[in-house]
Amino acid sequence: MEIMLDDGAYMPSRGHRTDAGLDLRTPKAVTVPAYGSAIVDTGVHVALPHGCAGLLVSKSGLNVRHDITSTGLIDEGYTGSIVVKLYNHGGEDHEFEAGDKVTQLVVIPVVCEPLERVSAFNATERGDNGFGSTGR
């Protein structure tokens, strides 16, 4: 996958060869206030493979240890810098230094089927049974 970096940006990397997510880092120090949010421009540009999208997914360690979450969607044709919004669900400010990991990019295949309006769906075993319908 082709990657371009703005000045000061860090090359995405995997912690282990088989990790699904590519770690993205902040090029600048940033504070995410308690119960607040902050926007980080990673300076990373990607040319996603045809038929794929990129999901920005929280780093599990940041989520579990520091209550920091993130999410986002990068469409195949987007080549601008990846920007992520970090949410702090905890009661203390969280400081990131330049070079710290802030989120991870997971590249996934996407099916883009044409839409067709219908008046009813074919019957399925589950139907429209939702929350709690399968029991405990």
Describe the predicted segments one by one:
Residues 1-136:
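DUTPase catalytic domain/fold
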